Amino acid sequence: MNKHILVTGGAGFIGSHVTDLLIERGYRVTVFDNESTGKRADVNPQATFVHGDVRDEVALEAVFKTGINAVIHIAGQASIRLSFMHPEADLNVNTLGTINIIKQCIAHRVGRLLFASSMTIYGTPDIAPTPETAFPAPVSYYGVTKYAAERFAHITATRKDLDFEFNVTSFRMFNVYGERQSLTNAYQGVFAIFMGNVLRGEPINIHSDGEQSRDF
């Protein structure tokens, strides 16, 4: 039987591409998404779609009961600006939502978790390109919630009281962009914002002196 993969946030532009690749490689996929930013139309028709929120433990439990072999956890609030406007929502979705995923993995003995973290956990590092070993020093609420989620997951993987092996991999992604990404969402990454400006014939607004740079 093909392995059953749960993709949270699978209706988003990253998650939908991950789902496509998994199905192409023969996996059975369930997409779990609240469609707050993702689009149902972008979900591969061969995937099982469940409308749900990672903050809803009851909905998550129902999905895990279908027999999940691994989880790719992409669902989350991804705007730094919104994290400052609504920090409690950022914490609830990014950190507590991830804890809910971890709890279900433990309850149902799901031994593989891949977590979509963020480069924001590094803050403003002095080294460019920034190596994975750079010290985490987030300077935004968003970065704090993603780093906290990482630590909960990786510490769980070291627990000696679990009766199964729990493997975790976190991906600290830098300004992801591509097909299916919204070009009208002002809270998306800088690439999408700039591309949207160009396609609409609008000026690209760069704040400060224009000399600032970052590791992409």
Question: PLM features: what roles do these ranges have?
Answer:
Residues 1-176:
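N-terminal Rossmann-like NAD(P)+-binding domain of SDR-like oxidoreductases, especially those catalyzing
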Residues 128, 151-215:
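NAD(P)-dependent short-chain dehydrogenase/reductase
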